[in-house]
Amino acid sequence: MDKKKLNPLARFRGFIQAGATLLTNIHLPNFAKGTLYQGSGKYVCVPGLNCYSCPGAAGACPVGAFQAVVGSSKFRFSYYITGILILFGVLLGRFICGFLCPFGWFQELLHKIPSPKLSTKKLKPLRYLKYAVLLVMVVLLPLLAVNELGMGDPFFCKYLCPQGVLEGAIPLSLTNAGIRAALGKLFTWKACILLAVIVGNVVFYRPFCKWLCPLGAFYALLNKVSLFQMRVDTHKCVSCGACARACKMDVDITKTPNHAECIRCGMCMKACPTDAIQYKFGLGDKSNNEATKE
């Protein structure tokens, strides 16, 4: 395929991911100081999975912010947090996972480490675990499992999220003796999860995204209706199967162009010999294969 025809988003995705990670964690001097940014930016949720307690974090993690509201003794439905999540999802869907999520980029970098690689095609049922994590750990447990003051824990952040250890606990403990002294069994548990995720990513492609990420689960629910879509021109498609073989998210884009697991990474576009797959943004303009099905 002529590289000149490849969409710039797909061609420069790695640079976009790096830039998004830098902008999300722009307060770099705080890593050396061992302090957190506490400015007005922390009232704004970033689109990807990025820990609030990261020294460099410029904004709040949407998952953590949602749990904080749900687990509050003065719980009121948060139109802001829910609304901004829906806005992100309706505008971009899982494009956020593929381009704007710092932890997603971290997983892809790990997968580049030379090693035997294993397919996840036979493990597709595991993808439904992330919906259980979203429902149980992000919504139900913080809402229902409360203490005597009526406060609930942020269960996902506290017990499962590896990003919190990677971006928060480890950097802060390196510069703060008090934090190092306070590390206990919970940190050990979370560190083991992080280690498992790191090892898993070396051999599998983005397993946390596929199987456990509640933010990915939320965006997946809106992937088919998001304004940012994948389009397949069936007049150009020769049914060679190159796109399905290239997809590391185990999606056959010719059958389901906007599958819940599609992170819009563009690997299928790079593999297509006839330039039949493109990005589209906006209402209408359905792909030929979608129109044919109707």
Predicted regions and their residues:
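Non-ligating segments of multi-cofactor redox enzymes
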Residues: 1-254, 260-294
